[in-house]
Design a protein with these regions (language model features):
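C-terminal cap of metal-dependent C-N hydrolases
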Residues: 67, 79, 416-459, 489, ...
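Bacterial N-terminal signal peptides
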Residues: 20-31
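Bacterial N-terminal signal peptides that target proteins for export
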Residues: 4-22
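Polyanionic/metal-chelating signatures
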Residues: 161-309, 432, 436-437, 442-452, ...
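His/Asp/Glu-enriched, well-ordered alpha-helical/loop segment
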Residues: 53, 131-133, 139-144, 284, ...
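N-terminal pre-domain segments of enzymes
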Residues: 38-59, 458-482
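Histidine-rich, glycine-flanked metal-binding segment
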Residues: 46-60, 69, 73-117, 497-539
Length: 881
């Protein structure tokens, strides 16, 4: 009998809760995800393996009808997909009538309003590995096999499925020039390690070039060869020379046996046997790589020994030698936008994947991260944003191209008849930041089914509803006149402190906005920029960044984010901001016009931050608010602590604050008596914060740490904003009852506990806003604060209203730093920080077209766009020749 399963009427949700005591101890499970106990306990959502078992069972066969199909071969279309025995048996275009009267017994899934995409294929993953990913003792570890350490109980598998990932290549780390053999896994939850292994997948092996195998950042004494790039080249020379000789030895032996002789067989060497497999083509090389010089070296070395590199992994400078990679025939698998975390990553550009594709290279986006793999659709979408890549080509970078790189292009990676039914149902376009996976199917069986632990699915939570409903511009916008006016006319204006204004106008005079509305009268001498079809937004404010203090992660000489010596309240970042930092222009291109540049380490009292704009030639030109906040990293308190006593470092903080207050009393008394002030710059700097006269950024992440930080702030009578609060969702009501604001981040990160809901970090902002907590959002990404809009977009996708998400990175961020009167919204009288885009500010596919800071239009070029232009010209020059 035919069964119908209508996704539009049956929402797959499970609400659950767990009691979270003052000491983060599980005391009691209460019904209702948001119940509040009468005693001193709080409840919060959780997940168990039992909850993760899908309720939808297909038996490997189903019909998914009237769904928007993204085949990864052509633009999306409305149609129906039939699955039988775990395989796709039919893909038809056009709307279908109800199949409820059919008689073949297949489960019917109504996909109306939904999107069906191929499962994501991550060609570079370390998920599901037990006991570490590296074997660092030797330079060559080809005898090792990652399949020996597969962990089927790694919760990362389930969370990857929640992001639509169906296949991964499980790789060793990059400690070895020639590492161990890899394994391709089909992700399933609740199965054995053997059941994860992709049957008959080609054998791969991990190579590595550059800083990692030569141990540049290992620290301590390095005595393992090689320690240079020329040494790595020698490893390949020597290893494959020996492998050739090994093969010749066995060939001679086999020939002698064939002639009836009884020779002594050569000594079997698993390591050399694997290398011989590379030479013979049965083992495929996937090589970690960064710099163009080492990439070329490996290609030439492979050609010298007669084999082909299957994929260059990471390949951050691949765009520099794109033509050579294409000629060799290697595929490339890169990050979407990671850069600068070490010196060999400093020339990475977000156009890399697209430029390699343009050269004819089989190009993919990989994760190398349990978090990044959860949104690889969106990572691929960034190539649309930064390089104008076609959307189908972008989708292929997360699906079909990866299948081909793994030698599985005829079995997975696209929605085609005959391929495995590895499918993902989403409620929006897979490249959209606003899409959520509804279920993930592997071999025709549902392996992930979306839970809704927080009751937020398609919610529209806001802590400022009046801003979303009040009238936009005044009925009769004020007329403006005068020379030097600039008007942006005809675009959709998103003011942040009110609803959007279609066909709106923003007028700038000097550094200020002088009018915003839908019918502003303009004088004849006003300069006009046509914004028709475009969107105008307030410039975003990136809170708690190292912008200007940090250049390259692995190079200490470029890092001024932290200081030694414990508590340093008088230290300010202001004069250390480097105006020529490449990060400034790279960050600006996402629509970020201001940052709060903050100390990032040391402490617990780390020092004072400053607010800077991202357009200036000296630190004095950049800084717009000096010493805006004092940053304190509240000492961590374990969630399973046995008592609520202050840790020793908290007691020390209390003592220091009291010392600062005493210093102020004594200094005031001295002044009253005509005496010289007491000379202590540390206490002088700390006193206004200790007395609640200035605001403190109190960093606290874990639930118990948050509770301790709030008690500390309350008892010390401090003016604080909580920063981080990654487990704020566990204690949202407590934060609300304290009346505190929070800066949430990172949003794009994995939950701390295996039993936290898979979406707890994504939904954190919405849970807090629902409780009435004023929120701002930060990226918490030293290398990529430019990804702030995507963090806000994810928060919006997981329950926060779009208006509230916009305010979280504009107006609320301005409120945090005390600059809401001049920044954070497109409002007459405020500074003219304006961003023009071709679409939704938070979408990964949206392009930022133009920007103004203080009324001055700023360049949209940066170090990365310059490199892109330079090497794109090289590519086309090579093609022309």
């Amino acid at each position: 009998m035919m069964r119908n399963w209508n996704l539009n009427t049956k929402i797959i949700m499970k609400n659950s809760s767990i009691t979270f005591g003052l000491l983060a101890t599980v005391l009691l499970a209460l019904p209702g995800a948001h119940a509040r106990a009468e005693d001193d306990t709080v409840t919060h959502a959780f997940e168990t393996d039992t909850m993760r078992v899908p309720t939808l069972q297909t038996g490997g066969a189903c019909i998914i009808q009237n769904v928007t199909i993204h085949t990864a071969l052509r633009p999306a279309f409305l149609g129906t997909v039939v699955v039988k025995d775990g395989k796709i048996t039919s893909v038809t275009e056009g709307e279908s009538e109800s199949l409820s009267g059919a008689s073949d017994g297949l489960l019917v899934i109504d996909g109306s309003g939904k999107h069906l995409a191929p499962g994501v294929i991550d060609t570079h993953s370390h998920t599901a590995i037990s006991g570490g990913v590296n074997e660092g003792t030797l330079t060559i570890t080809a005898d090792c096999d990652i399949s020996d350490t597969i962990d089927p109980d790694d919760v990362g598998i389930y969370r990857a499925l929640a992001g639509g990932v169906t296949t991964i290549q499980c790789l060793h780390g990059s400690a070895n020039a020639i590492g161990g053999r890899s394994e391709v896994l089909k992700l399933k939850w609740g199965v054995t390690a053997a059941e994860l292994v992709f049957p008959d997948a080609p054998q791969g092996i991990k190579f590595a070039l550059g800083e990692n195998p030569k141990g540049s950042n290992w620290g301590g004494n390095r005595d393992r060869f090689p320690s240079s790039r020329r040494g790595i080249e020698a490893v390949y020379d020597r290893a494959f020379t020996r492998a050739v000789a090994y093969g010749e030895g066995w060939k001679t032996y086999d020939e002698a046996v064939a002639q009836g002789e009884d020779p002594t067989p050569p000594r079997r060497d698993i390591r050399l046997e694997t290398l011989l497999g590379i030479l013979e083509g049965s083992v495929k090389v996937h090589s970690h790589s960064y710099r163009a010089d080492e990439i070329l070296m490996l290609l030439r070395k492979a050609e010298e020994f007669g084999f082909r590199i299957q994929t260059l992994q990471h390949v951050l400078e691949g765009y520099k030698v794109a033509a050579e990679i294409a000629e060799h025939g290697a595929g490339t698998s890169t990050f979407s936008d990671w850069w600068n975390y070490k010196i060999e990553a400093y020339d990475a550009i977000p156009q890399n994947a697209a430029l390699l594709h343009e050269a004819g290279v089989l190009s993919t986006i990989n994760s190398d991260s349990d978090e990044l793999m959860r949104h690889l659709y969106h990572e691929a979408a960034k190539s649309v944003r930064y390089a104008g890549l076609d959307r189908v080509d972008a989708l292929q970078m997360a699906t079909l191209n990866g299948a081909k790189q793994l030698g599985l292009g005829d079995r997975i990676g696209s929605i085609e008849v005959g391929k495995d039914a590895d499918l993902v149902l989403l409620d929006a376009d897979p490249l959209s930041v606003y899409s959520q996976v509804q279920w993930t199917m592997v071999d025709g069986e549902i392996e992930f089914e979306r839970l809704d632990a927080f009751g937020l699915y398609r919610a529209d939570v806001t802590s400022n509803p009046e801003m979303d409903i009040r009238s936009g511009a005044p009925a009769t916008p004020p007329a403006v006149a005068g020379e030097g006016l600039l008007a942006l006319v005809g675009g959709t204006v998103h003011p942040a402190d009110g609803p959007a204004i279609p066909g709106g106008t923003v007028v700038i005079f000097g550094s200020r906005i002088v009018a915003v509305g839908a019918g502003v009268e303009l004088p004849d001498d006003c300069e006009v920029i046509d914004a028709t079809g475009k969107h105008l937004w307030p410039g975003m404010i990136a809170l708690d960044t190292p912008i200007g203090l940090f250049e390259i992660g692995s190079v200490p000489a470029t890092n001024d984010t932290s200081e030694l010596g414990g508590n340093q309240p008088d230290l300010s970042v202001t004069s250390s901001v480097h105006p020529e930092s490449a990060h400034i222009a790279v960050t600006r291109i996402s629509g970020i016009t201001r940052t709060q540049t903050s100390p990032q380490g040391g402490g617990p009292i780390m020092g004072q931050s400053s607010v800077i704009d991202l357009d200036g030639m000296t630190w004095e030109e950049l800084v717009c608010k000096d010493r805006d906040m004092l940053h304190i990293n509240f000492p961590r308190m374990r969630n399973d602590a046995k008592d609520d006593k202050d840790p020793e470092r908290v007691t020390e903080l209390r003592d220091l604050l009291e010392e600062a207050r005493s210093w102020r009393r004594l200094t005031d008394a001295a002044a009253d008596n005509g005496l010289a002030p007491l000379g202590d710059r540390r206490l002088e700097a700390l006193a206004p914060y200790a007395l609640g006269e200035k605001r403190i950024a109190l960093h606290a992440d874990g639930a118990q740490t948050i509770l301790g930080a709030m008690r500390f702030a309350r008892e010390e009578e401090l003016d604080v904003v909580l920063y981080g609060v990654t487990e704020g969702w566990k204690v949202a009501d407590r934060i609300a009852s304290e009346g505190l604001s929070v800066v949430v981040g990172p949003v794009l990160s994995v939950p701390r506990s295996d039993f936290d809901p898979f979406d707890s970090r994504y939904a954190n902002a919405a849970v807090l806003a629902r409780a009435g907590v004023p929120i701002a959002i930060m990226s918490s990404d030293d290398e990529n604060p430019r990804n702030l809009p995507f963090a806000a977009g994810f928060a919006a996708n997981w329950g926060l209203s779009k208006g509230e998400a916009l305010r979280a990175v504009t107006l609320h961020a301005a409120e945090v730093v005390g600059m809401q009167d001049s920044l954070g919204s497109l409002t007459a009288g405020k500074r003219a920080d304006i961003v023009m885009t071709d679409g939704d500010l938070f979408e990964a596919t949206t392009q930022v077209l133009r920007m103004w800071i203080d009324g001055n239009e700023v360049s949209m070029s940066n170090r990365q766009t310059d490199l892109y232009d330079k090497y794109r010209a090289r590519l086309h020059s090579k093609i022309a020749k």
